[in-house]
């Protein structure tokens, strides 16, 4: 599969980096899924609109930050191109609009 694995945590990057393992990330994971090669378009559109910031562009991972208000509407209505989507509404409900999210995109090529 050529594409990306995207995960969204309800923590700023400096806090997300402290988490090790699935048990540690589970309470903060909002959603994760697999997409094809154009699957970062929505993130880059947020960056272009000034609603997200790209922190790293390495692919291992590429990292973005954005406020929940700008990302949650997107993930609450899953798109057909989001493969293997794991959606965690119980964690999403805990986010305020101002929560800073860490969005990691791992290159699957």
What are these regions (language model features)?
Residues 1-97, 107-109:
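Acidic (Asp/Glu-rich) sequence patches and key acidic residues
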Residues 101-105:
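Short, hydrophobic/proline-enriched secondary-structure or compact coil segments at domain edges
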């Amino acid at each position: 599969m050529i594409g990306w694995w995207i995960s969204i945590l309800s923590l700023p990057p400096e806090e997300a980096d402290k988490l090790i393992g699935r048990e540690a990330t589970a309470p903060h994971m909002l959603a994760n899924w697999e997409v094809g090669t154009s699957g970062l378009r929505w993130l880059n559109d947020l960056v272009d609109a000034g609603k997200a910031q790209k922190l790293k562009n390495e692919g291992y991972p590429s990292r973005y930050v954005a406020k929940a208000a700008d990302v949650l509407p997107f993930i609450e209505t899953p798109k057909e191109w989001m493969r293997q989507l794991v959606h965690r509404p119980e964690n999403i409900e805990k986010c305020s609009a101002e929560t800073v999210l860490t969005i990691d995109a791992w290159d699957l090529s």
